Amino acid sequence: MIYINARFLTQRKTGVQQYALVLCRELVKHIPDICFLTPKTDLIDEKWRGEFNILQIGNRNGHFWEQIELPRYLRSIGNPLLLCFTGLSPAFYKNCYFTIHDMSLYAYPKWFRLLYRAVYKVNYAIQARFARGVFTVSDFSKSEIEKYLAVDSDKITVLRNSVDTSINIKNNIENKVVRRKEILLVGTLEPRKNIEFVINSFLNSQIEGYKLIVVGGLGAAFSKVTFSQHENIIFCGYLSDDDLELKYREASVFVYPSLYEGFGLPPLEAMQRGCPVMASDRASIPEVCGDAAYYFNPEDSSDFSSKLRELIENYDELSPVLICNGYRRLEQFDVRDVASKLMDVISQRNI
């Protein structure tokens, strides 16, 4: 029996939760004996109760559950293999693979609260030493882990983010998609996502007829008050999967301006819906997007504005190329390949 730290099933879905969900949905097709361990809570969506073998344990939640009750339960049943896909894992639990999505708290510590940095740095340092192995989502993140944690390369396995294959990209081809004059951003409103940069650049560019649609929860370090009154800036907050799907399909351009990402899933989600992508040229983003994005310097407002204007003014010529390249790019991120690689790692190490 393999156990999965499924605390992510009790959390609001962002990139790391989406990563875990897509991968776990594929794993259960191939490995019958998987148990998903969660805190006792009513927050779990009923559809996951029907799809996963969920066992609720302990009496607490949050970090206490993850660091105390989860390993206590595992030790009581013989220390079975535990897989953790969303960041933190039980410190000192050795029969474990844990996932580091990025090293932003090392590269840009000012973006994070002191307590957050301390908790994650201690956990990463301990588990990098004691765990069986480390999963990460890109070659860029692997190199960053080696740099900041001094982990041997052989201990790190790259399991890339993958797209949800239940979404049929042929729908974009067979059914004519009506694109609105909308530029879409998706991401938590926090400093590293660089949303404020795009908002200011968009307003200064004075591109007529287009609206900037910002989707994502509000981060503590970012205030929307300054911009919320502008008629061409629309803050949607956190959207349901269905509403976000509609935004991807309606937008003329998807913009991804992050300064630092371990992977960056939203550009692939946009490509899957046939939406042309403009992306930052930093960190892992070129590794992920390849030739399927129109790149810009995320710290140069004039570069962003000129690239956006260029894409819009030459939309009929440039967008089909980006869309076609995007569909081809998606073939590199098939969840079946990721699950197969994970199972190979497990079997090769005689788990």
State the predicted function of each range:
Residues 1-351:
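Carbohydrate transferase catalytic cores enriched for Leloir-type hexosyltransferases
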